[in-house]
UniProtKB/Swiss-Prot annotation:
Residues annotated for (6S)-5-formyl-5,6,7,8-tetrahydrofolate binding in this entry: 29, 91, 130, 463
Binding residues annotated for GTP, in chain numbering: 235-240, 254-260, 279-282
Encoding gene per record: mnmE
Cofactor: K(+)
UniProt subcellular location: Cytoplasm
EC code(s) of this entry: 3.6.-.-
Subunit: Homodimer. Heterotetramer of two MnmE and two MnmG subunits.
One MF term in the entry's GO annotations: GTPase activity
Signal peptide as annotated in the record: none
Main location: cytoplasm
Keywords: Cytoplasm, GTP-binding, Hydrolase, Magnesium, Metal-binding, Nucleotide-binding, Potassium, tRNA processing
Official protein name in the record: tRNA modification GTPase MnmE
């Protein structure tokens, strides 16, 4: 995709998910200078309905040559600049499914539109000044949100809660640059620069950047979720734990060791964070080739998980098998889950032995659905203590934004070093301009075409 391509021509795409025989409504979106003309060719509105902006018309979509009715539909007309793209936009609200929307899209393409590239509607909104780059990225995050908190954070970005502080930081850098350049151009007419004040201002900007950088881990958690692996010996209650936690019968539960032969996955939300829970096969030495594959997959799941729930049988206590598994997973953030406590005398639970460097212990009786709240609390404690990091701010930055903020901070540190070394003022401006450019990349005030391509390729065709 190129910027020239993105702002020329009229584009069309299906804007809703295509679910065969399930979706009740399907939307075809058209944007560009020919959008209204295409709609007037295809759409027949009976009676005295008026084609006005931001009004919904009822009627029929007809083939322009055969006049055959393709669908009974609603038409929404939005004239520039009061539309998502700030261009003329029409939306055909058709019956759901596959056939109707595909036929309508084909008629739009035959009428002069071209098929939109992924994210091209939002790219046009950005290029036409309706959105900045952080807001555009927030739209993608909102569409892909997997939890209420992820959606709320994306909405905060869409409302400009990230763009505003970034613009203010950039403006502060520009003010400092103006002071320095004024001394370069009019040195004899102005008082000397206050070096200490400039350093103080730069330190304040860098401190605010550090606060924003602290939200990166939270952003990653909300976007990708927390991957949690339940591991342990066979028959310690791992599958029962998954079923109790997910409130379903995702995993088969029997009294026979080795029942789980593969990794069973369930998607949950804990404290607003999407959690991918993996119930793994019991880890032990075995001659069964199928079970051996399952054991190897269990080890792989544990080694790639953000958090490991090492599950043991409280009735049998800590065994050599538990110790062997612990040695394999102790390098990961870990919670020890003592399961089946309903089978143990309460007085004996506190005397159960385990490695003393395990600090997070949860007692559960998964078969009785007991201890799940305590388990979720322990997980959130690990997240909040930084073992799996997440900040408490309303907003959260992504990897691209974090890279730009990091570069801005490095540039500001280099400015400070330049001032301390008493180098000429021209040298001060070089790194200061670097910080300004890095901050501008976040909101899109200074951004390359390749970056735009990378960002908007994340979107679906109709967004």
């Amino acid at each position: 995709m190129t910027q020239l391509l993105a702002i020329t021509g009229t584009i069309a795409a299906i804007a809703t998910a295509i679910v065969p025989q399930q979706g009740s409504v399907g939307i075809v979106r058209v944007s560009g200078s020919q959008a209204i003309a295409i709609a007037q060719t295809l759409f027949h509105a009976p009676g005295k309905q008026v084609w006005e902006s931001h009004r919904i018309l009822y009627g029929y979509i007809r083939h322009p040559q055969t006049r055959q009715i393709v669908d009974e539909a609603l038409l929404l007309l939005m004239k520039a600049p009061r539309s998502y793209t700030r261009e003329d936009v029409v939306e055909f609200h058709c019956h759901g499914g596959i056939m109707a929307v595909q036929q309508v899209l084909q008629l739009c393409l035959e009428g002069g539109a071209r098929l939109a590239q992924p994210g091209e509607f939002t790219l046009r909104a950005f290029l036409n000044g309706r959105l900045d780059l952080t807001q555009a990225e927030s739209i993608a995050d909102l569409v892909g949100a997997r939890s209420p908190q992820a959606a709320q954070t994306a909405l905060a970005g869409l409302q400009g809660k990230l763009a505003h502080p970034i613009r203010q930081l950039r403006a502060n850098c520009l003010d400092i640059l103006a002071e320095i350049e004024a001394r370069i151009d009019f040195e004899e007419d102005l008082p000397p620069l206050d070096d200490e004040k400039i350093i103080s201002d730069i330190e304040n900007i860098a401190a605010e950047i550090s606060q924003l950088l602290a939200t990166k881990d939270k952003g990653e958690l909300l976007r990708t979720g927390l991957k949690v692996a339940i591991v342990g010996r066979p028959n310690v209650g791992k599958s029962s734990l998954l079923n109790a936690w997910s409130q379903s019968d995702r995993a088969i539960v029997t009294d026979l060791p080795g029942t789980t032969r593969d990794v069973v996955e369930s998607q949950l939300v804990v404290g607003g964070i999407p959690v991918q829970v993996l119930d793994t096969a019991g880890i032990r030495e075995t001659s069964d080739q199928v079970e051996k594959i399952g054991v190897e997959r269990s080890r792989q799941a544990a080694n790639t998980a953000d958090l490991v729930l090492l599950t043991i049988d409280a009735a049998t206590g800590w065994t050599t098998g538990d110790q062997e598994i612990y040695e394999q997973v102790k390098h990961r953030p870990l919670i020890l889950v003592m399961n089946k406590i309903d089978l143990v005398d309460k007085k004996l639970i506190t005397s159960l032995e385990y490695p003393k460097n395990i600090t997070q212990i949860v007692h559960t009786a998964a078969a009785q659905k007991q201890g799940i709240d305590a388990l979720e609390t322990a997980i959130l404690e690990i997240v909040q203590t930084g073992k799996v990091k997440a900040a408490d701010m309303d907003l959260a930055i992504n990897q691209r934004q974090a890279a730009a903020l990091t570069q801005a901070k490095i540039s500001l540190e280099q400015v400070q070093a330049t001032i301390t070394q008493q180098l000429p003022l021209d040298f001060w401006t070089i790194d200061l301009r670097g910080a300004i450019q890095a901050l501008g990349e976040i909101t899109g005030e200074e951004v390359t075409e390749s970056v735009l391509d990378r960002i908007f390729s994340r979107f679906c065709i109709g967004k």
